[in-house]
Amino acid sequence: MVDWASDSDNDKFEWDTDGEAETSSAPALRNIDAPGPSTRLPQDANGKANGSGALVAEFMGMGFPKEMILKAIKEIGDTDTEQLLELLLTYQAIGGDASVGNCSASACAPQTLEVDEEEDDTNWDEYDTAGNCDRTPHSDGSGDEDFFQEMSEKDEKMKSLVNMGFPEDEAKMAIDRCGLDAPVAVLVDSIYASQEAGNGYSANLSDYEDTEFSSFGGRKKTRFVDGSKKRKRYGSGPSGNQVPFDGSHEEPMPLPNPMVGFSLPNERLRSVHRNLPDQALGPPFFYYENVALAPKGVWTTISRFLYDIQPEFVDSKYFCAAARKRGYIHNLPIENRSPVLPMPPKTISEAFPNTKRWWPSWDPRRQFNCLQTCMASAKLTERIRCALGRFSDVPTPQVQKYVLDECRKWNLVWVGKNKVAPLEPDEMEFLLGYPRNHTRGVSRTERYRALGNSFQVDTVAYHLSVLRDLFPNGMNVLSLFSGIGGAEVALHRLGIHMKTVISVEKSEVNRTILKSWWDQTQTGTLIEIADVRHLTTERIETFIRRFGGFDLVIGGSPCNNLAGSNRHHRDGLEGEHSALFYDYIRILEHVKATMSAV
């Protein structure tokens, strides 16, 4: 059980804002700093809001159309009038009325995730037909009846994210991007991806570690911002003792900048002093991965449970054309590493040369941001096309900013004149180092979700490459929370024979993907276990007697919460599934103890 605690019952949440709304050509828009009707939501004598009706009237008095105001409130709620005003001004900047160009108001609403199975076969070209931007705005008002119910659902989602320590504005943006139906794990995924992209990471740094590093990663200076957020305490560890995860009892773990780990391919090894304690030495080797940008104290806790080994933080942008900030705790040797050949391209233009023809000069992106589990919808790409179609030459700076923000947020690529599209699953497979069609056979939605939660194979293979000479005759692997088999693919690409793999993975989709790949490429034994709770002490001992022990215990990223009960959220050890981290520790400890006794 999770026990939420607070340093003070009177804690207040105060979030930084991104600044004042930009000026725009909103009709009859007055100076919001001048005397006159307030832009804040009217309140009663008790200080409570009078409701959205008064807010609609307020913005209508400023000259915004009612349909546009209702659409904006429906998308982001009415709790933040400044953000509402900014959204309305954005509508003005990209269209001049509720539509962008002549697109319908509904098509120009802020982005929400569409993950219905009917969307799986979306033909992105169908929105590029002549006259598609000639639709006239229409609304029968039927959707407004459910309006306030949706807002209530959104408030509940926001409350959950805020209680997890995320800034309120970032929680709002994540819900806008992924939709109300998106699970909290997907929303957390989206927030971290946005933070890695720089879209809002500056909003509040008080829960994150901000550190300057030397060239290797030795600490030069660490600064922390004191926040006034509520603190959290988590439930029992494996021994039943209360373990705090709020960082209040932990020395913060510094994050290096840049995140290059102990070494990069084709670069000399940095001067690294890495003395592993005796209890951390193999057999077996172990390797544990988690998202780097975890809340303060989480990495210190993980390190403490894994023999006080310091994490190796790496951004996969040094291995491929997409960023992916991760931390790895392992007892592997760090000398004589070698990359998998051929090395993948590290820029978008090298990875997808066909995009060069359509890439505008005002789009400076050279690499993708962190690949997400949720994709942009066809409605968004249509809105962008309509916005750009209004200009015969270079669009205005306002429109450029709008388009670039969406392209960075959703990793959109240019596939035609004024036409962007999300990455296809096979393109994500290529960027992440998987063989083509590795995830083919399941729905598009499931492919995106699985790939967005997977290892970047080239990065992991570089770390595991030291095992090639140590196990020339093959190895036995215990793969915990295997996902779609990133570790197995990495070992295969290194030419390391896997004699036996015990794979623990809750998601049936992921197990199907791994089993299909295994049957096509491997000759060893694959044993799949659907629930980590089924990997009992007795079964571990049986496997060790049967196969002679394990050479590697490798754990998938706890941010990969595909099945809802198989992985942690992106905040590392947050929420009801935090016990899975202790399952990794429990299993590793028992493997080590049993093997030492054999």
Curated annotation (Swiss-Prot):
Keywords in alphabetical order, please.
Answer: DNA-binding, Methyltransferase, Nucleus, Repeat, S-adenosyl-L-methionine, Transferase
Question: Please, one GO biological process term?
Answer: methylation
**Residue ranges of the region described as Disordered:** 1-49, 114-146, 227-252
Query: Knockout consequence?
Result: Pleiotropic developmental defects such as growth defects, semi-dwarfed phenotype, reductions in tiller number, delayed heading or no heading, abnormal panicle and spikelet morphology, and complete sterility.
Q: Where in the cell is it found?
A: Nucleus
* Family statement drawn from the similarity comment of this UniProt entry: Belongs to the class I-like SAM-binding methyltransferase superfamily. DRM-methyltransferase family.
Name of the protein described by the UniProt record: DNA (cytosine-5)-methyltransferase DRM2
Q: Which gene encodes it?
A: DRM2
